[in-house]
Amino acid sequence: MAKSSKRRPAPEKPVKTRKCVFCAKKDQAIDYKDTALLRTYISERGKIRARRVTGNCVQHQRDIALAVKNAREVALLPFTSSVR
């Protein structure tokens, strides 16, 4: 026989939907030379943050990933973090 569970179901939390910053502000462009902007989309370990974390749309997340990779190639951004 199965044991009856007395646990209550978890309360449902409202889902926060983030809007893409670049779709909201049409004049803001993604450029590999803008390291201040790109650093906000890189974790402290040097990884590119996921789309579900940043809240960007698919196209702008791809553009950010491409810009980060280009900035790494021209040594504007590090490939890894300097923290050990």
Swiss-Prot record:
One of its GO terms (biological process) is translation. GO terms for molecular function: small ribosomal subunit rRNA binding; structural constituent of ribosome. Keywords: Ribonucleoprotein, Ribosomal protein, RNA-binding, rRNA-binding. It comes from the Bacteria. Gene3D superfamilies: Ribosomal protein S18. One of its GO terms (cellular component) is cytosolic small ribosomal subunit. SUPFAM superfamilies: Ribosomal protein S18. The keyword NADP does not apply. PROSITE patterns: RIBOSOMAL_S18. Pfam families: Ribosomal_S18 (PF01084). HAMAP family: Ribosomal_bS18 (MF_00270). Binds as a heterodimer with protein bS6 to the central domain of the 16S rRNA, where it helps stabilize the platform of the 30S subunit. NCBIfam families: S18. Part of the 30S ribosomal subunit. Forms a tight heterodimer with protein bS6. Belongs to the bacterial ribosomal protein bS18 family. This is Small ribosomal subunit protein bS18A. It comes from Mycobacterium tuberculosis (strain ATCC 25618 / H37Rv). The lineage of its organism: Bacteria, Bacillati, Actinomycetota, Actinomycetes, Mycobacteriales. The gene is rpsR1.
